[in-house]
Design a protein with these regions (language model features):
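Conserved structural motif at the start of ABC-family nucleotide-binding domains
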Residues: 11, 30-32
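Short beta-strand immediately N-terminal to the Walker A/P-loop
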Residues: 45-46, 89
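The feature captures the beta-strand-to-loop junction immediately N-terminal to the Walker
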Residues: 48-50
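Helix-to-loop junction immediately C-terminal to a conserved catalytic motif
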Residues: 63
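Conserved coupling/switch loops of ABC nucleotide-binding domains, chiefly the family-specific signature
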Residues: 69-72, 119
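Conserved ABC transporter NBD signature motif
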Residues: 71-82
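Beta-to-alpha transition at the N-cap of a short helix in the ABC ATPase nucleotide-binding domain
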Residues: 86, 92, 101-103
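Short helical segment in ABC ATPase nucleotide-binding domains corresponding to the A-loop/adjacent helical element
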Residues: 103-111, 121
Length: 122
């Protein structure tokens, strides 16, 4: 008999809130409230909704670019405390760095992982 390993959680949001302050004001904007879900390794998920509903905010928190105001975000069962070199995503809008060539934009992720320039070229 072969035992199957339990599916590994790729990303998990547990009771996540995100608030943004308005410049020059004490008012806050609630971008995400009590978000709880998990995605298993190999699972495909689509986050859809109208403009301004918090889709990009979730991606930013999942990648560690933005910290949640409350709750926990985990990637590969580890709490996200800052930018994660193993996480990348592409937004709907093309956000290439215009001062870099197409190849240099593609190589950027490898550079962040410490891959030598000679390896990037191959």
């Amino acid at each position: 008999m072969t035992l199957m390993a339990a599916p590994r959680t790729a990303i998990e949001f547990i009771g996540v809130d995100k608030r943004f302050g308005k410049p020059g004001s004490t008012a806050e904007v609630l971008a995400a409230r009590d978000v709880t879900f998990s995605v298993t390794t190999g699972e495909v998920v689509s986050i859809i909704g109208p403009s301004g509903c918090g889709k990009s905010t979730l991606l930013n928190m999942g990648s560690g670019l933005t910290k949640p105001s409350a709750g926990i975000v985990k990637v590969a069962d580890e709490v996200v405390n800052g930018p994660n070199k193993h996480v990348a995503f592409m937004l709907q809008k093309d956000l290439l760095m215009p001062w870099r060539t197409i190849a240099q934009n593609i190589e950027f992720g490898l550079e962040l992982r410490g891959v030598a320039a000679s390896e990037c070229q191959s």
